[in-house]
UniProtKB/Swiss-Prot annotation:
Its EC number is 3.6.4.-. This is Holliday junction branch migration complex subunit RuvB. Residues 4-184 are annotated as: Large ATPase domain (RuvB-L). The keyword Disulfide bond does not apply. It comes from the Bacteria. One of its GO terms (molecular function) is four-way junction DNA binding. Residues 185-255 are annotated as: Small ATPAse domain (RuvB-S). Residues 258-336 are annotated as: Head domain (RuvB-H). It is an enzyme of class 3 (hydrolase). The gene is ruvB. Belongs to the RuvB family. Has 3 domains, the large (RuvB-L) and small ATPase (RuvB-S) domains and the C-terminal head (RuvB-H) domain. The head domain binds DNA, while the ATPase domains jointly bind ATP, ADP or are empty depending on the state of the subunit in the translocation cycle. During a single DNA translocation step the structure of each domain remains the same, but their relative positions change.
Length: 336
């Protein structure tokens, strides 16, 4: 799988991405973009604090790299409580989840990333914990086994997923608040890039930040990653100052084009156009044609291409739009 090698893949977290934690917003007033999410969460958090209650359980979903973990941290900071972090694949046994739940303080936030990957056994334990703040666990084995109930303090579960459709209905229905994160607009990304540049001590023009933002695929994680590579280019090839021209040169060298596409995006679109005459083409055939897994196409490649109007998902398969044909300078076929 080539996803891990892609500079603009938001689905993989590089070691240097961890350094971004220092520049992530800590409070809602610092949170840029997602205006509807921000305004709603501001009300929900204030209401919970006025009542002295734990915030309702929160499900955050959307493409990778849009700030689901950041939003979970902000919620905990705004509520003035601790944040405990884990992920679906890590919670292999019911005891793993029980250990985390019994260590929570009142109103604490438990953040489970990739919550769609919870095992059915762990999920069953989660239901009464979310609904009644109770933990039902089995002690012993065989005929001597017995169930005991443990009362839990009121807490907030925040689940994050890129695949909301993979959640079971019983789990999804137990979240009182559901927020979808959308791709960011270019002006918001420009602000994020400029802010990150200041934190990194870089001299960067507004146009330079705009150039990076335009090619960041609507994703803050990618914007910050591109910024670091542009910084490297500016320091080695120039005097370290990042202008629009320097940013464009650096990103062209990295094969990230003006639409934010890299070689995998272009490979996918060209496969649909050249090998399947623009489509429709089934997902399995497309995955085989470009040597990728269907999950990577669905979760990583497709969302941005569809959102930007380059790819269309139809009942018969994927189709390249006229905009995709024009992007490569190829004349689209006449419509019947």
């Amino acid at each position: 799988m080539i996803e891990a090698d892609r500079l603009i893949s938001a689905g993989t977290t590089l070691p240097e991405d961890v350094a971004d934690r220092a520049i992530r917003p800590k409070l809602l007033e610092e949170y840029v973009g997602q205006p509807q999410v921000r305004s709603q969460m501001e009300i929900f958090i204030k209401a919970a604090k006025l009542r002295g209650d734990a915030l309702d359980h929160l499900l955050i979903f959307g493409p990778p790299g849009l700030g689901k973990t950041t939003l979970a941290n902000i919620v905990a900071n705004e509520m003035g409580v601790n944040l405990r972090t884990t992920s679906g694949p890590v919670l292999e046994k019911a005891g793993d989840l029980a250990a985390m739940l019994t260590n929570l303080e009142p109103h604490d936030v438990l953040f489970i990333d990739e919550i769609h990957r919870l095992s059915p056994v762990v999920e069953e334990v989660l239901y009464p914990a979310m609904e009644d703040y109770q933990l039902d666990i089995m002690i012993g084995e065989g005929p001597a086994a017995r169930s005991i109930k443990i009362d839990l303090p009121p807490f907030t579960l925040i689940g994050a997923t890129t695949r909301a459709g993979s959640l079971t209905s019983p789990l999804r229905d137990r979240f009182g608040i559901v927020q979808r994160l959308e791709f960011y607009q270019v002006p918001d990304l420009q602000y994020i890039v400029s802010r990150s540049a200041r934190f990194m001590g870089l001299e960067m023009s507004d146009d330079g930040a705009l150039e990076v933002a335009r090619r960041a695929r609507g994703t803050p994680r990618i914007a910050n990653r591109l910024l670091r590579r542009v910084r490297d280019f500016a320091e080695v090839k120039h005097d370290g100052t990042i202008s629009a021209d320097i940013a464009a040169q650096a990103l062209d060298m990295l094969n990230v084009d003006a639409e934010g596409f890299d070689y995998m995006d272009r490979k996918l679109l060209l496969a649909v156009i050249d090998k399947f005459f623009g489509g429709p083409v089934g997902l399995d055939n497309l995955a085989a044609a470009i040597g990728e897994e269907r999950e990577t196409i669905e979760d990583v490649l497709e969302p941005y291409l569809i959102q930007q109007g380059f790819l269309q998902r139809t009942p018969r398969g994927r189709m390249a739009t006229v905009r995709a044909w024009n992007h490569f300078g190829i004349t689209p076929p006449e419509m019947p």
